[in-house]
Amino acid sequence: MSALHLYNSLSRQKEPFHPITPNHVMMYVCGMTVYDFCHIGHARVMVVFDTIARHLRASGYQLTYVRNITDIDDKIIRRAAENNEPIQALTQRFINAMHEDEAALGCLPPSIEPKATEYVAEMIAMIGELIAQNHAYIADNGDVYYSVRSFDEYGKLANRRLEDLRAGERIAINEAKNDPLDFVLWKKAKTGEPSWESPWGAGRPGWHIECSVMSRHQLGDHFDIHGGGMDLKFPHHECEIAQSEPVCGGKHVNYWLHNGFINIDNEKMSKSLGNFFTVRDVLKNYAGEVIRFFMLQSHYRGPVNYSDAALEEAKRGLQRLYTALETAPTTGGAILLPYQERFVAAMDDDFNTPQAIAVLFELAKMLNKAAAAEAADIAFTLRTLAARLGLLTGDAKTLFQQKGALSAAEIEAEIARRQAAKAAKDYATADSIREKLSALGIELKDSATGTQWYYR
């Protein structure tokens, strides 16, 4: 196995990766709450952990990748009521949309995708364990709360003391709680809302307990990697630790991974600021692979600044890689080990995709200048390494075709007209056709065997 190092949010440093079971990695990632279309922040979570999953598999590990679906939540209940739509119909509609979005981004499905509503019985059982251990209590209002004072290490993931958390957080006053930071495990049923019977009366689970239960059920009391967006680090993941460690017998996750935020033109993405984009919004103007490439150009832990200019730059970069392969051999070839080793070293260094992509550009530059005898090995290496990032697997002519632009057949017809004009020595017409295509972002490359075209 490789010398993989991960940045562990819990220790706040890079650590060598050692799976609990040799050659087998167990990874849980917090998924979507399905009440709306996925936004580009969700897209980053999808792309980041899909890329991590791809690298783990390519490194020889068997991977069990679990990503949950939250299909019961206050937001879901509220949206279903607003739409006058059954909750299950609403959630299934947005689950289907989520799957379409991740497929467009080139993401492979997780190994297991549990839904919260499928594990309510297990949630009730775990809450019962926490009550029995005096980590939770039944409040006067019928809710069940977790007592943060019962867990001495609460705040260790956020690296903040309990007193500091109380002082720094804006917490709504709730007289039913023993402590303002206590969080709900079970919500007493309200009229018109879904509910399940429990020893504490009818109700439904809180958000935090859902992930503790689903990860435990699928991966056991102790697993390798838990991931999600930086916004989940506190309180969600902090609360998961507090819930899981008492019932799992100690440390339940070895490595905590968090991806950074997406900003819009250097401002935080927010519906109130009017700079909120769904994946579908962006896919209207850019291919999914362009969005994926854009996100992988930044290290997963850092912020990404989304703008049209940045997407256009990413598109041009991806086109350069595809263009290098345009006339390269599509069969044969052997891996160039020095480039593979550098690529793998970058990915083993906490999934450093910017450095890995730099290796791809070096190969593309070599390929543009390569003699025929060398081209097959370079092209094979470029395609093989790019595929580990989920890149360069599509058809460039389809990928970069502008909305409303000429189809491939129409471009070929224009090239044929140009060839006929050149044969008739009508060079003015031939030049005019080339200029027309160039204005549409289509470049022509003439050779002894004919004319190739590609998007600039």
Swiss-Prot record:
Q: What's the top EC group for this one? A: ligase
Main localization of the protein described in the UniProt heading = cytoplasm
Cofactor(s) required for function per UniProt: Zn(2+)
The reply on keyword Metal-binding is yes
Residue span of motif 'KMSKS' region:
268-272
Please report, in chain numbering, the residue ranges of the motif 'HIGH' region: 32-42
Query: Which cysteines share a disulfide bond?
Result: none
Per UniProt, the cofactor note for this protein states:
Binds 1 zinc ion per subunit.
What processes does the entry annotate via GO biological process terms? cysteinyl-tRNA aminoacylation
Do the record's keywords include Plastid?
Answer: no
Pfam family for this entry, one: tRNA-synt_1e
Family the UniProt entry places it in: Belongs to the class-I aminoacyl-tRNA synthetase family.
Protein name, per record: Cysteine--tRNA ligase
User: Which organism does this record belong to?
Assistant: Dichelobacter nodosus (strain VCS1703A)
Q: Which gene encodes it?
A: cysS
